[in-house]
Amino acid sequence: MDAHVAFSGFPTLPSVSPSGPQPPSLAGDEPGREPEEVVGGGDSEPPAAPGPGRRRRRPLQRGKPPYSYIALIAMALAHAPGRRLTLAAIYRFITERFAFYRDSPRKWQNSIRHNLTLNDCFVKVPREPGNPGKGNYWTLDPAAADMFDNGSFLRRRKRFKRTELPAPPPPPFPYAPFPPAPAPAPAPPARLFRLDSLLGLQTEPPGPLAPEPPCCAAPDASFPPCAAAASPPLYSPAPERLGLPAPLPAEPLLALAGSAGALGPLGAGEAYLRQPGFPPGLERYL
């Protein structure tokens, strides 16, 4: 609806040309009485030429249009070519259509911006990547097209409430910054340990055993040398179960003990057996 339709009730009066006759003097008017003033809500009309016996009229004051901010925004969007406008374009439409909003723009522009963000009937449309410019577009929700009675912006039926906010459609592929990534391939299942694989592992053969220290024979002859070595151990696990080499028999140890007795008793501080043919003078390196 055009904004000037609301103010079309006033009759159109002829205008005064600069070369026309000058208005007569108002000396015959009653003293102490002001001329009549007509207050309206639209644009000012040109002063009418006072005829004989008529009083002079003042210019009409600029009144506020009888439209709410929601109606002003909906009016601007309805007159847009693509039914969408930026915030700056909405400001421009209002100031060009209504002269009242040309003064003090900061007050009413804040109200326009708040009504755009707080009312569900207005939807923000992002700007396409290939469309340069500043700011997003605003459009009217298609479900709110019948928000006003009979297309009149003076009467609004009820507050529009959107049940769910639909997501804006994604831009087409040429305008997308990156092509859509393919779906990742399913990961292979994790490898599980099986009992057969654990039993099939071969144990590494252990390293060479440290040589056992020789038995120390006490000076007392009543204690037989290497008696502890000749006694069998309390517990001897099966060597084939542990994968260890079989222990040495006790006969070489007894033979070694016999050779130690033939060499004679150990002196004080000697904790080793001197083998035959050992060169003298090397004990200090042991």
Curated annotation (Swiss-Prot):
Domain of life assignment: Eukaryota
SMART domains given in the database record: FH
Record has Plastid as a keyword: no
Keywords on record: DNA-binding, Nucleus, Transcription, Transcription regulation
Database matches in Pfam families: Forkhead (PF00250)
Biological-process GO terms, alphabetical: anatomical structure morphogenesis; camera-type eye development; cell development; cell differentiation; ciliary body morphogenesis; cornea development in camera-type eye; epithelial cell proliferation; eye development
Main location group: nucleus
Region (Disordered): 1-62
InterPro entries xrefs: Fork_head_dom, FOX_domain-containing, TF_fork_head_CS_1, TF_fork_head_CS_2, WH-like_DNA-bd_sf, WH_DNA-bd_sf
GO cellular component: nucleus; transcription regulator complex
DNA-binding region location: 64-158
Localization per record: Nucleus
GO molecular function ontology, one term from the record: DNA-binding transcription factor activity
Record-linked PANTHER family: FORKHEAD BOX PROTEIN, FORKHEAD BOX PROTEIN E3
Job of this protein: Transcription factor that controls lens epithelial cell growth through regulation of proliferation, apoptosis and cell cycle. During lens development, controls the ratio of the lens fiber cells to the cells of the anterior lens epithelium by regulating the rate of proliferation and differentiation. Controls lens vesicle closure and subsequent separation of the lens vesicle from ectoderm. Controls the expression of DNAJB1 in a pathway that is crucial for the development of the anterior segment of the eye.
Protein name stated in the entry: Forkhead box protein E3
Organism taxonomic ancestry: Eukaryota, Metazoa, Chordata, Craniata, Vertebrata
Gene, per the UniProt record: Foxe3
